[in-house]
Amino acid sequence: MPIYKAPVEDVNFLLNDVFQIDRYDNLPGFSDASADVREAILGEAAKLAEEVLQPLNRVGDLEGCARHDDGSVTTPKGFKEAFKQVAEGGWLGLSAPAEYGGQGLPVTLSQAVNEFQCSANMAFSMYGGLTMGATAALIVHGKPEQKKMFVPKMVAGEWTGTMNLTEPQCGTDLGLLRTKAVKQADGSYKISGTKIFISAGEHDLAENIIHLVLARIEGAPAGIKGVSLFVVPKILVNGDGSLGARNGVTCGSIEHKMGIHGNSTCVMNYDGATGWLIGEENKGMQGMFVMMNEARLGVAVQGLAQSEVAYQNAVAYARDRLQGRSLSGPKAPDKPADPIIVHPDVRRTLLTIRAFNEAARAMVVWTALKSDVAHRSSDPKDRQEADDHMGLMTPVMKGVLTDVGFSNAVLAQQMYGGHGYIAEQGMEQFVRDARIAMIYEGANGIQALDLVGRKLPRDGGRAVMAFFNEVATFAKEHGGDEAMKPYVAPMSTALGHLQQATTWLMQNAMMKPDNAGAAATDYMQLFGLVTFAYMWARMAKVALDKIAASGATPYLTTKLVTGRFFMERMLPETSVHLARIQTGCATTMELAAEAF
């Protein structure tokens, strides 16, 4: 059976030493998250993930969710009790504003908790994750009465939330949606249409489900400019907050999926359901993007989380599985064979996964900290810089962390040989569960196009130039340190590749957009590698300083070796991405469609 141990030590290293979040005590909520409080929260979060959620992961995969004749849906055995424990423990509202019943702690902390839960049970974690994304949209764009009516119950886990975008004929292109909204005399709307692929659309974990639904008001402009956002509760809410009549929204069926079987992915039918406008008419994408950006960062964490749990299991197997002898002579002469972890190619594979996991985790903490600054700082300049960072890094994180997270799940499965293909080992579930993260909340090809088409040129390239300057400044400050050269020199080379690629796109994509389209995925992966290199250089600097001050520890020594492995064996791929980008789109676009 699979195992999982939350990486508390690594998270503490990032929070306390690399990013020193105590320096942000001036931000609301940070002074409440002292080192002792963080340690206690992470410890309890680890216990919850390891002892409650992880044992249910296999159960959820085998049982799945069941739809009944009346349209109701039941979740796998144990999910309801676990969700109650999560809700009553305040885990859903860890970073939600105190005015709505949350604890108001930093997002930086709640994202670490999110990783633990996603590793332990990705399908289960989605029920709460989507709920908090919906609350974020309501808090930013909802009317005061909507916030009062819905958000506290959602933060408490008494009600959950969803987002309803996709329809059979429209996925990425939401301008094609057909769900309609008809305004009523009392100011409400009647919503009619069908939505598909709705995660947590119907279940038995909470007494009400609050759906955020994109629809088109009668007479609205065509395309994306005519889309509005509505809040549509499963059960109507009376003026005093009590539950009233059942609304006209039902689960038509549950999708039969490759993975995340423990999450109820539904076809939702809206048959004149009562809903209320969120924000302004025809500006629904503004509200939905709040939720989608939250979701994209959450999905990025899913990529990391599945890579982490797959890695832990692959390492455990590699230590125990006896097969063959070391190329340099027997390492376990008293046994019939050596454990496979002695073999260089096995170590290469495991280090490849580990080096990604630790850099990706640093990137998540770094970006979560920027999110806290963007939403909590009183300094307009700091908020703008943090918001720039969020806009730039969101597509990179969503695309790269989920692409590599899936690849790493496959690599970890490979460590098991034929046993990894057998369901009882649990590795094939990690592969199946990780796959969806590359698709939903904006397929990764769309993330790449968003990066090169919108985020790169935005505000005259202000965000990307700020990133370049930050990395270059770090390299200049530490390049002369002999101990840092194995980290700084490769990082600087990779940064040069990214800068060359950026210049090429600026010179060749404006007049020929297909050049940008053909280069987009390589550019996104290149950007991710450079960001990982920067994270590794920062972690290496802190590790070296701690060793100089207090001596080496196994954790710090391992950190430095893993970082060097990344620089030597993974970062050189930036030159390949650059070469592909600079070839342009000629061969990509040359063939007629019929030739494929």
Regions found by a protein language model. Name each.
Residues S188, S192-R246:
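A short core secondary-structure module
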Residues P2-K5, D10, G90, K183, ...:
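Alpha-helix capping/hinge segments and adjacent helical runs
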Residues F197-S199, L236-G252, K257, S264-A295, ...:
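A glycine-rich, basic-preceded beta-loop-alpha segment at the flavin cofactor/substrate interface
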Residues F79, L130-T131, G142-Q184, A368-D387, ...:
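Internal maturation/activation junctions in enzymes
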Residues Y100, R458, F474-F596:
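C-terminal amphipathic alpha-helical interaction region
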Residues M1-S125, M149, D372, R580, ...:
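Amphipathic, small/basic residue-rich leader segments at the start of a protein or domain
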Residues G29-D32, L62-T75, G287-G298, Q312-R354, ...:
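Glycine-rich cofactor-pocket loops
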Residues M132-A134, K143-Q146, F150, Y440-A443, ...:
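A structural-propensity feature for long, helix-poor, extended segments
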